[in-house]
A protein has these predicted regions:
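Conserved active-site segment immediately N-terminal to the catalytic lysine
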Residues: 25
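C-terminal accessory subdomains/tails of enzymes that are appended
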Residues: 1-10, 16-20, 29-40, 44-295
Length: 295
């Protein structure tokens, strides 16, 4: 993730990676009222990974790969000093055929497969995030076939949660919540009605509200401090240091909902601070630092 001003793309674009037969996505993120955006994110890499599967890390090599490809296609020069945040993940690709011409993961098929064991266990493997619904449909349909029922997966014709047409918003809070949650925003506004302090900022300088941390726990299965500040909101990606400063207060807010002891609160905070420190070590700047350096 980099400040939008470094790229200034008003639409998502696909750019080629020189000498690598791959492409990168360059996507504007978080629209502002003047028609511009706050951030642009760029990716992805496709490299073999041999580390812990439950904690994949974005390496300096990954960052340099993305930036080199970006700089080959834009007129500005984007450096590691401009990188605000990163995230990484793994995808389980189907094992290639023994006669496959290339051993590169980038050349492997992204199609998924549904397998059924002799004992009736249905497994879906391969695929990618953008085809998650189709993958689930195929797996559910296979399970229904094994059970001998005539029902089929219904998600093809169902709207996403919160999708109920355009909503007219009258306040900044309404605009923010309606934009992020759609019709589910009513639940967050109800939280604010019961406790007006939940309309306050979650992290200084970022758009998220305290009610969103509560909602993340009660409605979105957030189970850790990192879940709330990195995955349900994107606070850590947008301003790591401001988020780290807010982490103790956020921890106090969600701890009663999750039944945490003082020892668990301390462990949650320590883990989150360690994650931020790893990004500090990678040389990632915050948005505030980028703005200050640009003046």
């Amino acid at each position: 993730t980099v400040p939008w001003e470094k790229v200034r793309n008003d639409i998502a674009v696909v750019i080629p990676v020189p000498k690598d037969r791959r492409s990168l996505f360059v996507v504007p993120w978080v629209p502002k009222g003047d028609g511009t955006y706050r951030y642009t994110y760029i990716g992805t890499t496709d490299t073999d990974y041999k580390g812990p599967v439950d904690d994949p890390q974005c390496t300096k090599d990954d960052i340099e790969y993305v930036l080199n490809a970006l700089n080959a296609s834009v007129t500005t020069n984007v450096t590691t000093d401009d990188v605000l945040g990163v995230w990484s993940g793994l995808r389980p690709l189907v094992k290639p055929d023994e006669n496959a011409k290339s051993g590169r993961t980038a050349d492997l098929s992204r199609r998924h497969k549904v397998l059924t064991s002799p004992t009736g266990v249905v497994t879906v493997t391969g695929g990618k995030l953008t085809t998650y619904r189709e993958m689930a449909e195929d797996a559910v349909d296979e399970a229904q076939k094994i059970l001998g029922t005539k029902k089929k997966c219904r998600t093809r014709s169902l709207s996403l949660r919160g999708a109920t047409g355009k909503r007219w918003s009258s306040t900044d809070v309404d605009v923010h919540l309606d934009g992020r949650y759609g019709s589910d925003a009513a639940a967050l506004k109800s939280l604010i009605a019961g406790d007006p302090s939940l309309a306050d900022e979650l992290v200084d300088g970022l758009p998220y509200l305290r009610c969103e941390a509560v909602y993340a726990v009660t409605h979105e299965m957030a189970g850790t401090l990192d879940d709330v500040l990195t995955r349900r909101t994107r606070s850590r990606l947008f301003d790591r240091r401001a988020t780290r400063a807010a982490a103790p207060a956020v921890c106090d807010l969600i701890a009663p909902l999750l039944g945490w002891s003082e020892a668990e609160k301390a462990a949650q905070l320590a883990h989150f601070v360690d994650e931020c420190a790893r990004e500090d070590a990678a040389g990632l700047v915050t948005e505030a630092e980028f703005i200050a350096a640009s003046k």
